[in-house]
């Protein structure tokens, strides 16, 4: 993913003639954007992560990976889960106009606690030093921002609410128990934390399910507009 994005960024820079660009990554797009920023820091103005696995990995990934080692049911259960997640990834690719190969098992490994710790050891810029603090606002000349949600069941018409209602059970008993169904509140912290408790689940954060978000919460589109203005006012 990182190398794919790096090539895309280099193409955009070449076509647009821009000196630097702003990167914004959701979910696994967070470490992907951070990787590109580490590779070409002089061409990146800012990195913003939304519901990203940054400070720590996802208990959901940990649980699925640990279940894969169970006797009898482990292998078939993991196969089923990866097929479902691959299908979901393909659906996202379809609605976003991209069609790329999916490897959800590799994604789970990278999103796990061990995978995230290994990634952060190589690419620490913007990661908080404390369990639930903020990271460096500026690192290698790049502005760092993040936001995330702590909603799970936000709209009864949204079919992903059922999935996140189940995945959120993986956070029971965890210190970082507040979550968006996939990522813990503190785990999402990176650079300047704009907010970490929007009443949004993991798909609400990018308005993925055709606007099926909570009617009582901030409109996700408004959050992105505000951030675009924030970057503009910062001269980015």
Where are these regions (language model features)?
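Generic detector of well-ordered alpha-helical segments enriched in charged/polar residues
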Residues: 61, 82, 109, 120, ...
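Phosphate/oxyanion-binding active-site loops and adjacent basic polyanion-contact surfaces
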Residues: 1-5, 220-223
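Serine-hydrolase catalytic core
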Residues: 89-156
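C-terminal catalytic-base region of ester-bond hydrolases, centering on the histidine
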Residues: 129-236
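Serine-dependent carboxylesterase/thioesterase catalytic core
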Residues: 2-115, 180
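Short linear motifs at secondary-structure transitions and domain/linker junctions
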Residues: 23, 117-123, 170-175
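Generic alpha-helical secondary structure signal
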Residues: 30, 39, 109, 123, ...
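Short, flexible coil/linker elements and helix-boundary hinge sites characteristic
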Residues: 69-71, 93, 97, 124, ...
């Amino acid at each position: 993913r990182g190398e794919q994005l790096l090539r895309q960024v280099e193409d955009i820079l070449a076509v647009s003639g821009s000196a630097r660009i702003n990167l914004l990554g959701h979910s696994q797009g967070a470490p992907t954007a951070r990787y590109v920023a580490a590779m070409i820091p002089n061409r990146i103005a800012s990195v913003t992560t939304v519901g990203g696995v940054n400070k720590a990995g996802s208990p959901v990934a940990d649980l699925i990976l640990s279940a894969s080692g169970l006797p009898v049911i482990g292998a078939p259960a993991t196969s089923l889960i990866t097929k479902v997640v691959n299908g979901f990834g393909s659906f996202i690719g379809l609605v976003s106009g991209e069609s790329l190969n999916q490897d959800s098992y590799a994604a789970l490994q990278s999103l796990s606690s061990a995978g995230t710790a290994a990634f952060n050891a190589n690419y620490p810029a913007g990661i908080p030093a404390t369990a639930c603090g903020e990271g460096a606002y500026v690192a290698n000349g790049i502005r760092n921002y993040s936001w995330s949600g702590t909603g799970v069941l936000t709209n009864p018409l949204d079919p992903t609410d059922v999935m996140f209602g189940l995945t959120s059970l993986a956070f029971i008993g965890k210190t970082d128990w507040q979550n968006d169904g996939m990522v813990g509140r503190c785990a999402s912290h990176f650079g300047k934390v704009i907010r970490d408790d929007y009443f949004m689940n993991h798909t609400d954060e990018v308005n993925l399910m055709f606007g099926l978000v909570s009617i009582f919460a901030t409109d996700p589109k408004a959050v992105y507009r505000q951030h675009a203005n924030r970057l503009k006012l910062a001269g980015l």
